[in-house]
C-alpha cells in the first residue's frame, strides 16, 4: 500500500483494513476460482507498477451488490495510490452505445447536463434562466424507484423511450407487474420489445443509420453520425417525436 497517499489523500483506511482482515487470498481462492498465489501476484503487480489502471464493465456493476463491487475497486485504487497520475485511475466501461452522451446531457434523475446537481440552487438557477422555466428542486426517481412508485400507486402513467425494463430491470417480474398496473403506457422504440406488449401507445422511432446524431465515448471523443438510410414506415427521430409532443 501507499502509506503517504493514504495518509494525505484518504479517510477510513483503518476501518477498511479491519473489515478485510479475514479475507485472505487463501480464503478467497475457492470463492474466486483463482489460486491464492495468482491473486497475490496480480495484487503486487498492480500495486508496484509505475502506472496501473482498472477497467471494468457490466460484470462488476450489474449485480444486487454492484455498488459495493465498484467501491472495492475504488478502495484498491486509493490504497495503492494508483490515481491522479498518467496511466492510473479507474475506468468504468459503459454498457450500451451513447450511455456516456446521455449521462453528459443530464439523463440522470439527480443531475442536470454537465453533472450539475438538481439540489444545487446555483446550478438550478442557471438552467432555469437558460430554459426559461421553473425547475423542480427535488431529484427524480431511479428506474428501480419508479417501479416501486407504480406499485404504491404514486405513478399511474409512463413514457418509456429506448428502454426495455420488462427485461432489463433487476427484478423483471416486479417490473412487469408494475407495467401492467399503469393506466397509460407510451413506448417509443425501434423494435417490438417485451415492454411494448404492455403499451397503450407505441411510437415508432428511427434507428442509428436512419437519423443524424452524435455518440460520446468515455474517452471524451464525440462521433458525428449522418443519416444513411430512409426511415421505414412512420418511424421518426426521437427528438422530432419529443418536439411534436411538446407542441
What are these regions (language model features)?
Residues 1-98, 121-247:
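Cofactor-pocket helix-loop regions in the catalytic cores of large enzyme subunits
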Residues 117-118:
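Extracytoplasmic/lumenal acceptor-recognition loop(s) of multi-pass membrane glycoenzymes
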Residues 100-109, 126:
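Long, low-complexity segments enriched in small/aliphatic residues
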Residues 109-113, 165-166:
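Conserved thiamine diphosphate
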